[in-house]
Amino acid sequence: MANIKFIAVSRSLSGILDYVTNREKTVERLISGVNCMAQTAQDEFEAVKKQFRKTDGRSYYHIVQAFAPDDPLDFDTAHEIGLKFAEYFKGYQCVVVTHMNTAHIHNHIIMNSVNFENGQKFHQSAREMQQAKEYSDQLCREYGLSFTESKADPFRIPAWKKRLCRTIKEAMENCATREEFIA
């Protein structure tokens, strides 16, 4: 079964699309769109955001679906699984790209943060992440694939984030007014 990771957004939408579609990592037939055309995804994502006035905040989600190196899997089948997995996110536009340049086959799924049907922004709660992983596992079972253990708990809060929350909470408790806290 595939290991699913929601990757922290660190690039612009154009930057991540350039990265995942890099021809040193994939080929044209392994680049597809779900509810959009892969070649015009950036414009389509932005049009949906403008239509629903949701141009601020996170613009996309980056999901990696990695398969075990010893799975009896070819690139086209991995891509097919990636497309089916992307369809799980109903109403969201996704670009699905299968990378061929590492020991393990993996899909990159770039998903618009705004639903094109109702304008709702996607929020990746721990529950939603777990449900997505379970759906991916179900797809892998259907294709007779093995299980890939996650190297890290996807729901673990990083230590730096816990420290930051504690520091902010302490600062809030030591301030009498909002202005004092901001200063």
Q: What are these language model-derived features?
A:
Residues M1-A183:
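N-terminal nicking endonuclease/strand-transfer module with a His-rich metal-binding environment
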